[in-house]
């Protein structure tokens, strides 16, 4: 689930307050069942909390809110992603320089 965690935390951070599981599932391309499973896992890890809408006619309606832990996790995952991409870029730059050096000889 670690690969999906960043995707989910990012989507939940940007989701409208009234987004339900079906809406989130459609937006991310997952089944509603998998969406429910992942949301429960994120709640269990403390990255997310589900709050009932007080003024909602639908008493089963929840909004999903990132916790401070969830936001920290999202930041750490984003930093790791950026670092990984920098390393890939630098490796490509070195490879390009090697190819240029071989070609110019």
Where do the PLM segments sit?
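Short, cationic-aromatic polyanion-contact patches
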Residues: 1-7, 20, 53-74
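Alpha-helical residues within the helix-turn-helix
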Residues: 26, 44
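Amphipathic alpha-helical dimerization/coiled-coil segments
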Residues: 73-105
């Amino acid at each position: 689930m670690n690969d999906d965690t960043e995707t989910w935390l990012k989507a939940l951070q940007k989701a409208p307050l009234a987004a339900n599981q079906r809406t989130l599932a459609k937006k991310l391309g997952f089944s509603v069942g998998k969406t429910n499973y992942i949301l429960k896992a994120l709640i269990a890890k403390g990255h997310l909390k589900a709050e009932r809408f007080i003024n909602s006619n639908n008493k089963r309606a929840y909004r999903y809110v990132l916790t401070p832990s969830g936001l920290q996790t999202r930041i750490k995952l984003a930093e790791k992603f950026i670092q990984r991409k920098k390393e890939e870029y630098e490796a490509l730059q070195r490879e390009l320089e090697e190819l240029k050096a071989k070609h110019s000889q």
